[in-house]
């Protein structure tokens, strides 16, 4: 059999994966049914970008290493006992061990490489040999919920931009961005929710069409003139609108600079973190890029990075012209720097610019999913959040907008940014709702790995830490260990998510609210300790907001003086 006729173990066009719903179990308990349903939900055709290839989002972020591994994971989860733990190594189920009932049912490690070898070249070699997979953040940890998972974080960022740059009023303002994939696809909806109009450049027309169908983008344009006309009309009417422009981001950004047009805000969410699979070089078609990836990877990577350099140079020019310009966490500045753009980091990342004060209080992307499949379960939990946090109109407004404007993808889910003060009591309340029958089936609670204590990423979440500890990756490892000790239902530890190989380490957790008293205890521990690691990490770095939060919430941090001084 020739190389070209060997079946691709990662591609099966015949497979359509839909998670079960309702109360009938396919596994032995809800503690194993939950990871089973969430794994399958990651591959739902309305959730995953390329489900037939096991790709969930973010270039090549997969849910399982290949279809054989997927089938075996499903088989094991169906037979797994409540005192056993499944070990998953880069999407491959490698062992089942006797543990105990409060231990995680699944422990996952994805894409981790010894630092000296932690680069795309070495990873791609292993990936081609079937020895690894790229887990991104929530793809390989089975808690991706579609674009909603990033909408609120993006919304919070745009609200902060409006507050910092435009006196809190985004009316008549517009954002230029690139990328409408799994992460970037959240941008247009988040922008219009925050009052901005948006022009989003995307080279894959199917992505624009999908965002149109799901209500994340309002209109499509095929020329820059057409897109700018839509933006100009929105500026005149004051009504925010989003437009997806079919094109290459590097080309369009450079053209906008050439025309002397200055967006109010400039950013980017193309998959620049992965130059081989995630970014289309200038002048290339999608088909040509796909063929070249098989023929000569080095040429693809070089061409992509050269185009990124062009785009970043345009972003720098727009910043110089007065546009509020920010890196939205895809590592495009690093790629441009490697191509000789020496001032690529002259515009900031979004976390130090807008999000870090939230991280200091353990506030981040808290998300939950209704395993029943019934949207009413989510609406009831929305109401419970409002009852338990009555004095936060900003949060209430978010929940109202989310219900009105966000379509569920796969299993019904919700995200809302809450912190150390609120996560545990919300989780325990959800568990009580399951116990008393208010909800039709259990809820799972998880989060993005982009959270306050679960990631080390010097070009994104930990950029510019005040004590210089940007690259210290002990923190996500400790977060994973503590979540394991606290009784999370599944725990994951990944490398390279968001910004690519060699640039990040991060951890995730998911906890099941099945209505039992044991679950209530686990939920209380996990949903306090998990965000507390974020407060701890930022307090240790010397942030006053975190030190004060630690004192208010009674955290025991032996080396942190809660009188607002940092003890080394």
Curated annotation (Swiss-Prot):
It is found in: Cytoplasm. NAD(+) binds at residues 58-59, 136, 182-184, 202, 207, 248-249, 269-273, 279-280, 328, 498. Pathway: Amino-acid degradation; L-histidine degradation into L-glutamate; N-formimidoyl-L-glutamate from L-histidine: step 2/3. Its cofactor is NAD(+). Gene3D superfamilies: Urocanase like domains (3.40.50.10730), Urocanase superfamily (3.40.1770.10). Disulfide bonds: none annotated. It is an enzyme of class 4 (lyase). GO terms for molecular function: urocanate hydratase activity. The active site is at 416. The keyword Chloroplast does not apply. Its main location: cytoplasm. Binds 1 NAD(+) per subunit. One of its GO terms (biological process) is L-histidine catabolic process to glutamate and formamide. Belongs to the urocanase family. This is Urocanate hydratase. It comes from Photobacterium profundum (strain SS9). The gene is hutU.
